[in-house]
Design a protein with these regions (language model features):
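Transmembrane beta-barrel architecture of outer-membrane proteins
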Residues: 64-68, 105-109, 142
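Low-complexity, flexible helical/coil segments
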Residues: 40-46, 104-107, 118-125
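A short, acidic, flexible beta-alpha connecting loop/helix-capping segment that sits on the rim
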Residues: 127-131
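Outer-membrane beta-barrel "beta-signal"
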Residues: 110-116, 121, 139-151
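Strand-loop-strand
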Residues: 95, 99-116
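Short, conserved loop/turn and helix-capping segments at secondary-structure boundaries
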Residues: 102-103, 137-141
């Protein structure tokens, strides 16, 4: 089965300027968005405004684009075990800019899905095709585990 998810969202830029340390805003990274990137690691940082790009406090973006493509297939149908191959692409920005696909974060990977008695379990490995802007997120790939659904 092939699943595609596409999201684009924005937050009122003038309202966002009033919140210096806001918990809201758009962050990407982690098993439910850009797999392969650390959770909430993709987005503007305070260092981006002081010349230390990719360093500092996570600020969250005002604009966000995310696309996920998955192909799932049965591995052990009687047990409810499935395999998944995926590709994710997205980014967040502090101000509206033309979207350049060559600058978007891109990941791919594989995983296992099991419909257990506890609910859907996911074990996925994501690999960064593009480099991270976050100086603290130096891993090229990461394993992640989740209980619950994605699509």
């Amino acid at each position: 089965m092939v699943d595609v998810k596409a999201l684009a969202d924005f937050e009122d830029d003038d309202a966002a300027k009033e919140d210096i340390y806001r918990l809201e805003g758009f962050y990407l990274g982690g098993i439910n968005s850009l797999r392969g990137y650390a959770p909430r690691s993709v987005g503007p940082k305070s260092g981006d405004f002081t010349g230390q790009e990719g360093a500092g406090i996570d600020l969250g973006g005002n604009f966000m684009v995310l696309t996920n493509l998955e192909v799932t297939f049965p591995l052990v149908q009687e047990a409810g075990l499935k395999g998944v191959v995926f590709m994710d692409m997205g980014d967040t920005w502090s101000r509206l800019e033309p979207v350049k696909f060559r600058d978007m974060k891109l990941t791919s990977g594989v995983g296992l899905r099991w419909l257990s008695p506890l609910g859907p379990l996911r074990l996925e490995w994501g690999y960064k095709i593009t480099e991270s802007d976050d100086v603290s997120d130096t891993d090229k790939s990461r394993f992640e585990f989740s209980i619950g659904t994605f699509f």
